[in-house]
Amino acid sequence: MSKIVAVTAGAKGVAHTHLAAEALSATAQALGHQIRVERHSAEGVEAPLQGAEIAAADVVLIAADLRIEDVRFVTKPVYRTSTARAVTQTAAVLAEALALTGEETPQMTTDTGQRPLRVVAITSCPTGIAHTFMAADALKKTAAARGWEIAVETQGSVGSQNALSAAQIQAADLVVIAADTHVDDSRFAGKKVYKTSVGAAVKGAAKVLDAALAEGVVLGTNLADTVDALKAQRAATRSGPYMHLLTGVSYMLPLVVAGGLLIALSFVFGIKAFEVEGTLPAALMAIGGGAAFKLMVPVLAGFIAYSIADRPGLTPGLIGGMLAVNLNAGFLGGIVAGFLAGYVARWLRDAIKLPRTLEGLKPVLILPLLSTAITGLIMVYVVGTPVAAILAAMTAFLQGLGTTNAVVLGLILGGMMAVDMGGPINKAAYTFAVGLLTSSTYAPMAAVMAAGMTPPLGLALATLVAKNRFTAEEREAGGAAAVLGLSFITEGAIPFAAKDPARVIPSIIVGSAITGALSMALGCLLVAPHGGIFVLAIPHAVTNLGLYALSIVVGTLVTTGLLIALKKPIPAEERARS
């Protein structure tokens, strides 16, 4: 008689979960085996397995149609199959699972064969010279001694080395972050993550790995977390200039938001109140327009360069961006400066070879000096003046748009915001609008934000007024989609579009395009690039507030109407169990 612990999880509702559980229980008991089944469904986890039960088990059987974390079963043989096979071929599934109990050294397995535990790790310390690499070596040696597969990304003073790929992260069972600096963990959404200090990994890698298995935390799986995971997956697949540009934009955004809203607040006291020196409006204008807005382009350039060359790119990028401001080259000059500084710094970093004893001079002396000099001279003598002329011409054209041309531009920008919901096309429209804020051109920003809000809002409204066209899971997600839409997070529409792209995507594109066109036609202006409905409460953040809200409402209603027209009603039985 063998002791079996099992987990069942159907991808659609509770039916498959319970059918598989009952089939396994009945068949195992008929064969004289002990079995305990943990059931996963949309309603939560039923009858969770206890540590003592897992420890006493001879084998673990996972019948699931979605990913189930199996790190807690690391010391046991684990057999995986689908819920459908567990229902239709129960005896064969049990026989194949029990065949694993004869292994001398039980390892995590799948129904395609054995495999060791897969770990990905990041190590980083403030100085980045010694402890980063010592921690990486310690984790590698300890994992190898246990027969585990491990990949370690080091984030040192000369940038990231052995960067983890999206495929490595996707395949990993466990993530370990040993760092004394901030490490972005958004790309590990849905994974079991354990964080510790770099010193702990150096002094006790074995303890760190043991603690990671026992204490690691899995990121959540509600709609908001799903959206975050999708965004992280998209970020992981970005490469080349597109990735570098979006990195710069993401770091620039807080400055644009803070600066724009402070400028708007200065107008509360009167449109020209800031002209009186020593007053609060003058101070707010100095902070927002005089400081925050002046830093926008340098930060954009600095972090484009940082994305390309890591830390060595930051100094020449920031200085190149400041030169772009001084040369009136604006955000276009900042983009050029960022890419120039990044590639120059990366080339110097790779080309300059020093003895190990002098390696510490590269990040603090040699690279900043040479990369800044080269970038600065090219900006001053080659790039600055032509780019400034291009920016001036583009700004004059946009500010002189007639109503018809403004509507066309709004249609294009609005549609782009909904095409891929946070993807490259969406980000191209958004980056274009944000960049124009530095030239005091605010209409495209208003159109872009309004158009980015309507996809999740339209879907959320549709789940309320046309419940027979959505599953229970989708109807439940509608509330979260509404919050994401109000917050200007277009990605809230992705889970709906992924399930029914042929009907959802055309509906949201039309709704967003109409919203963008209305916003431009009605002369709406927006000085802040983010915030959704929450920024509308700030006086003077939006010009023509009532008409702007009307644009969003109309686009939302159009989206909802098209969804109702295109989506067919779902049978009642399927709506109830999905």
From Swiss-Prot:
CDD domains: PTS_IIB_fructose. GO terms for cellular component: plasma membrane. Its EC number is 2.7.1.202. The chain crosses the membrane at residues 251-271, 284-304, 319-339, 364-384, 405-425, 428-450, 477-497, 518-538, 545-565. Keywords: Cell inner membrane, Cell membrane, Kinase, Membrane, Phosphoprotein, Phosphotransferase system, Repeat, Sugar transport, Transferase, Transmembrane, Transmembrane helix, Transport. It is a multi-pass membrane protein. The active site is at C125. Induction: By fructose. Pfam families: PTS_EIIC (PF02378), PTS_IIB (PF02302). One of its GO terms (biological process) is phosphoenolpyruvate-dependent sugar phosphotransferase system. It is found in: Cell inner membrane. Its main location: membrane. SUPFAM superfamilies: PTS system IIB component-like. Residues 1-99, 119-214 form the PTS EIIB type-2 domain. InterPro entries: Bacterial_PTS_Sugar_Transport, PTS_EIIB-like_sf, PTS_EIIB_2, PTS_EIIB_2/3, PTS_EIIC, PTS_EIIC_2, PTS_IIB_fruc, PTS_IIC_fruc. Residues 241-576 form the PTS EIIC type-2 domain. The PTS EIIB type-2 domain is phosphorylated by phospho-EIIA on a cysteinyl residue. Then, it transfers the phosphoryl group to the sugar substrate concomitantly with the sugar uptake processed by the PTS EIIC type-2 domain. In the N-terminal, the PTS system fructose-specific possesses a duplicated EIIB domain (EIIB' domain) which lacks the active site and functions to facilitate phosphoryl transfer between the EIIA domain of diphosphoryl transfer protein (DTP) and the EIIB domain. The presence of the EIIB' domain is required for normal high affinity recognition of DTP by the PTS system fructose-specific as well as for normal rates of phosphoryl transfer between the EIIA and EIIB domains of DTP and PTS system fructose-specific, respectively. The phosphoenolpyruvate-dependent sugar phosphotransferase system (sugar PTS), a major carbohydrate active transport system, catalyzes the phosphorylation of incoming sugar substrates concomitantly with their translocation across the cell membrane. The enzyme II FruAB PTS system is involved in fructose transport. PANTHER family: FRUCTOSE-LIKE PERMEASE, FRUCTOSE-LIKE PTS SYSTEM EIIBC COMPONENT-RELATED. This is PTS system fructose-specific EIIB'BC component. It comes from Rhodobacter capsulatus. The lineage of its organism: Bacteria, Pseudomonadati, Pseudomonadota, Alphaproteobacteria, Rhodobacterales.
